[in-house]
């Protein structure tokens, strides 16, 4: 059985891309009730539903999404581990509660990178908090805040959204 179904080559891209995450949006598990994919590109999501609450966290320049390919020739399997590392300065009682709720659940997470692309991590299985810290720092210049590691495992890499989160049916909920 042949599994090689490549459809495109790849040219060397321009050097106009930057690293980093601008925002992440947490969505309660199963709130994305009507996921639809682009008819011409089934790796791209057109819609996540109607008026889906997306809780925005601003994580400029201090967070990353890494997708590790877990492939085994012996088992005939391939999966994609999605690891989201977040750093959020400043402790607050409101954030304490939300961090606790994120840790108890397994939300879907939309990642907006610094290039304006949106990815849906934990699309089917959600993302689990697998570690993190609530830290006051030691010296005056140290971070006082939260770090979180969320991990998910999916059959495919985190899908792109075809456009913005609001165009895909998300309702942005911002904090104070």
Show which residues each predicted segment covers:
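Charged, amphipathic alpha-helical segments
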Residues: 2-10, 79-100
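Solvent-exposed edge beta-strands and adjacent loop segments
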Residues: 10-83, 127-140
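Mixed-charge, glycine-accented linear interaction segment located at domain edges/termini
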Residues: 126-176
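N-terminal alpha-helical "arm" segments
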Residues: 1-22, 171-176
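Short, acidic/charged, Gly/Pro-enriched secondary-structure junctions
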Residues: 99-121
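Oligomerization/assembly interface segments of phage tail-like spikes and tubes
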Residues: 72-93, 142-156
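Short, hydrophobic/proline-enriched secondary-structure or compact coil segments at domain edges
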Residues: 21-29, 84-89, 105-113
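A general structural signal for short secondary-structure junctions and capping/turn motifs
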Residues: 75-76, 99-101, 111, 138-142
